């Protein structure tokens, strides 16, 4: 992908913000080297890594990555046999500590069943060198200073050195306490010159202490003298310092030699930790943006839900739905230069670069974005400044370059296509450029203020119009993208709001050609209907949410009912069994007494009568009643398939299987509600046997109410479905083999609803969108059985 587009879409600013979430220079370096990938599998893996990082952040808040340092230069010096200083060795030790902590951290997550396979595999590559880490920890502190615990010899040298220094200070302090000190010394302090302890003596008393003069003050009035009495002690101290230095060098050389045996392992650990830092930075950035992991498409499909430009204030930016690649591959955003059109282009372009770089995007869940081989953008006139060309020449030079490189895996963003020249010629060029881009198979989003391009979205099957909503009350754009609605000029409305005379406005309107005026009136009407539809849609969503909540409550109550019923039945069984058992016991006693009487010679009592009596008592004991959720009657096993009609046993409702979630669960459409239902709670409903086909003699009369097409444009969803249902009956009675249902392109909501209804109609054999001559995807052709 070309670097130029990253600059145009300000991807560098995204990387700068992302770098703030890195914990190390290694993470920052990986971020600044980040570039959008074009291979679908690579992008998919990068997105999964970020999602796993986000899962870790959600579960643990952070990861033990702090303390990671770039030690690659240190390792290179070890490779050529050099020794490291204390700070460099400490930094390697710190990386080894982070490696161990990170591996333990990841193992803990994996042990509790957290699904992070990619990052789990990454942590498996970390090698724990605990002995090496501990050797460094007991030898060097975080400032790089060698600790006394580094060796017994160093500890002994330093103990002797401290005692020697104490003796020197003690001797010099005795001079400071002398009663003549105030007279002979410039100041009662011990200081150091040339790394030897000295005292400040006035010039005139320099011979009193003997010894060596190491320095003097600027005025020459004070001499810094090492008295003769401490010269030997200072010499001893210097010798000990030399031994200390020698031992430190030996320790550093020894540790460096030890580390040289683990260069490859330390190098790999550091690289892996850098990857972890990079991935976790992406996850933290996504959390800060309130971003989501998008679904990826390798067929050019884009469906962004409530997408936001990541560089704009999240509290103020207007979220927009942007969809492309299914019903149309070209969007032409028309309307006046009131702002918002270019932001839409940049939002789509920048979110595409982010997604292909493995970043989450600021949009709602279930958003889909395509993976392109190249993203091209002609936005702004930065070239004209560089090359001293006119705005038009600048844009045209860029467009020529784009058309030479573009293919079916490309996204092109044209801003103000055809601008900077004669409007009529500019509009014609814009149309030709859009057609050329489509022939190359590219996905295109273009903005323009030329009204001539409004027709482009209507007379090209691959294209649709769009606009940015403008509020004439506030005289400002709302920045709401309206796909399917072309832009219109608001000049007359704005002028009226600003106080221009009505007579002038009326005269101006008369000068506008009828076709343009009708088009603007049509667009205005479409906008009003769209706003109404959006309000009704939101109301319907609210009702659906309420119905869903009610259904859940009902399901809960039904479950409670059956549980309570089972409990009561069980209690009744136990009570009844107790009563009968008691009766049996009493009967046994009676029978025993009767048999005793029989043995004693009592007449009239037969043995078989005793047995019959006991059998009848045994049968009186009630059987256990097992009844919970109704179970499906035994029948030939049926393998459920999408589209099957079923009965939901726990609800007693009929529904249709939509798709299989797992072997144990299905998505079921019950009326207007879609629910997850367990397979064991489903009973298959056999389809009705087809009735014997009747031969229908079609008699067409001039006053027959049924026509060969039904126009639903402008209808509400519920009204439209009722009309379709009634119309199909009339068309069947009239004997039509096929009919056309016109629903328009629009947002696709009505088209989708009608299509779903037709798929489930018992008399519909097949459905398809119309050919270009029949109205394209604004018309559905229905063939009857």
Swiss-Prot record:
ATP binds at residues 335-342. GO terms for molecular function: ATP binding; ATP hydrolysis activity; ATP-dependent DNA damage sensor activity; endonuclease activity; mismatched DNA binding; ribosomal large subunit binding; rRNA binding. One of its GO terms (biological process) is negative regulation of DNA recombination. Keywords: ATP-binding, DNA-binding, Endonuclease, Hydrolase, Nuclease, Nucleotide-binding, RNA-binding, rRNA-binding. Pfam families: MSSS, MutS_V, Smr. Disulfide bonds: none annotated. Its EC number is 3.1.-.-, 3.6.4.-. InterPro entries: DNA_mismatch_repair_MutS_C, DNA_mismatch_repair_MutS_core, DNA_mismatch_repair_MutS_sf, MSSS, MutS, MutS2, P-loop_NTPase, Smr_dom. Residues 710-785 form the Smr domain. It is an enzyme of class 3 (hydrolase). Homodimer. Binds to stalled ribosomes, contacting rRNA. Belongs to the DNA mismatch repair MutS family. MutS2 subfamily. HAMAP family: MutS2. Endonuclease that is involved in the suppression of homologous recombination and thus may have a key role in the control of bacterial genetic diversity. NCBIfam families: mutS2. This is Endonuclease MutS2. It comes from Listeria innocua serovar 6a (strain ATCC BAA-680 / CLIP 11262). The lineage of its organism: Bacteria, Bacillati, Bacillota, Bacilli, Bacillales. The gene is mutS2.
């Amino acid at each position: 992908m070309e670097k130029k587009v990253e600059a145009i879409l300000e991807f560098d600013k995204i990387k700068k913000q992302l770098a703030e979430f890195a914990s190390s220079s290694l993470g920052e370096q990986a971020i600044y080297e980040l570039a959008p990938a074009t291979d679908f599998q690579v992008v998919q893996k990068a997105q999964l890594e970020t999602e796993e990082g986000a899962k870790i952040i959600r579960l643990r808040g952070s990861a033990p990555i702090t303390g990671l340092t770039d030690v690659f230069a240190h390792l290179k010096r070890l490779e050529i046999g050099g020794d490291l200083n204390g700070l460099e060795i400490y930094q390697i030790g710190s990386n080894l500590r982070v490696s161990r902590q990170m591996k333990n951290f990841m193992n803990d997550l994996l042990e509790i069943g957290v699904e992070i396979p990619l990052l789990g595999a990454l942590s498996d590559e970390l090698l724990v060198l605990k002995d090496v880490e501990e050797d460094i920890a007991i030898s060097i502190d975080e400032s790089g200073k060698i600790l006394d615990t580094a060796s017994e010899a160093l500890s002994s040298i330093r103990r002797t050195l401290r005692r020697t220094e104490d003796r020197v200070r003690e001797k010099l302090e005795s001079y400071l306490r002398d009663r003549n000190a105030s007279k002979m010394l410039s100041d009662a302090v011990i200081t150091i010159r040339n790394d030897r302890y000295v005292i400040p003596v006035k010039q005139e008393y320099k011979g009193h202490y003997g010894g060596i003069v190491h320095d003097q003050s600027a005025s020459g009035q004070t001499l810094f003298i090492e008295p003769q009495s401490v010269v030997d002690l200072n010499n001893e101290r210097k010798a000990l310092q030399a031994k200390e230095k020698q031992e430190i060098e030996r320790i550093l050389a020894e540790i460096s030699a030890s580390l040289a045996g683990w260069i490859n392992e330390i190098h790999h650990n550091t690289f892996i930790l850098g990857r972890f830092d990079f991935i976790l930075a992406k996850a933290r950035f996504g959390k800060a943006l309130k971003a989501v992991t998008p679904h990826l498409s390798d067929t050019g499909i884009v469906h962004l839900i409530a997408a936001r430009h990541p560089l704009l204030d999240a509290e103020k930016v207007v979220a927009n739905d942007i969809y492309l690649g299914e019903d149309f591959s070209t969007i032409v955003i028309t309307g006046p230069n009131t702002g918002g059109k270019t932001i839409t282009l940049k939002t789509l372009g920048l979110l595409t670069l982010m997604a292909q770089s493995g970043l989450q995007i600021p949009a709602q869940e279930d958003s889909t974005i395509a993976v392109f081989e190249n993203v091209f953008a002609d936005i702004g006139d930065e070239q004209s400044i560089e090359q001293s060309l006119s705005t038009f020449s600048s844009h045209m030079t860029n467009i020529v370059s784009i058309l030479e490189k573009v293919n079916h895996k490309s996204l092109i963003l044209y801003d103000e296509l055809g601008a900077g020249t004669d409007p009529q010629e500019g509009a014609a060029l814009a149309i030709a450029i859009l057609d050329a881009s489509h022939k190359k198979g590219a996905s295109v989003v273009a903005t323009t203020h030329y009204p001539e391009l409004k027709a482009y979205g209507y007379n090209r099957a691959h294209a649709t119009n769009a606009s940015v909503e403008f509020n004439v009350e506030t005289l400002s754009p709302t920045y709401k993208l309206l796909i399917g609605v072309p832009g219109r000029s608001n000049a007359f409305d704005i002028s009226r709001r600003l106080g221009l005379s009505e007579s002038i406005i009326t005269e101006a309107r008369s000068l506008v050609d009828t076709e343009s005026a009708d088009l603007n009136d049509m667009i205005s009407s479409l906008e009003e209907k769209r706003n109404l539809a959006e309000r009704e849609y939101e109301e319907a969503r609210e009702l659906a949410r309420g119905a869903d909540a009610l259904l859940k409550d009902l399901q809960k109550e039904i479950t409670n009912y059956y549980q309570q019923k089972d409990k009561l039945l069980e209690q009744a069984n136990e009570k009844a069994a107790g009563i009968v058992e008691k009766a049996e016991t009493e009967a046994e006693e009676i029978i025993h007494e009767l048999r005793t009487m029989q043995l004693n010679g009592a007449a009239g009592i037969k043995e078989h009568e005793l047995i019959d009596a006991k059998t009848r008592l045994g049968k009186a004991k009630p059987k256990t009643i097992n009844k919970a959720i109704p179970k499906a009657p035994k029948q030939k096993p049926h393998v459920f398939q999408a589209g099957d009609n079923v009965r939901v046993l726990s609800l007693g409702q009929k529904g249709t299987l939509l798709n299989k979630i797992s072997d144990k669960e299905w998505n079921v459409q019950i009326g207007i509600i879609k629910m997850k239902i367990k397979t064991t709670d489903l009973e298959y409903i056999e389809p009705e046997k087809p009735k014997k086909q009747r031969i229908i003699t079609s008699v067409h009369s001039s006053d027959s109410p049924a026509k060969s097409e039904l126009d639903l444009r402008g209808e509400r969803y519920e009204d439209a479905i009722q009309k379709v249902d009634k119309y199909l009956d009339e068309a069947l009675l009239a004997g039509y083999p096929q009919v056309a249902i016109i629903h328009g392109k629009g947002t696709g909501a009505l088209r989708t609803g009608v299509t779903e209804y037709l798929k489930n109609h018992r008399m519909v054999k097949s459905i398809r969108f119309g050919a270009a001559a029949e109205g394209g995807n604004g018309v559905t052709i229905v063939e009857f059985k």
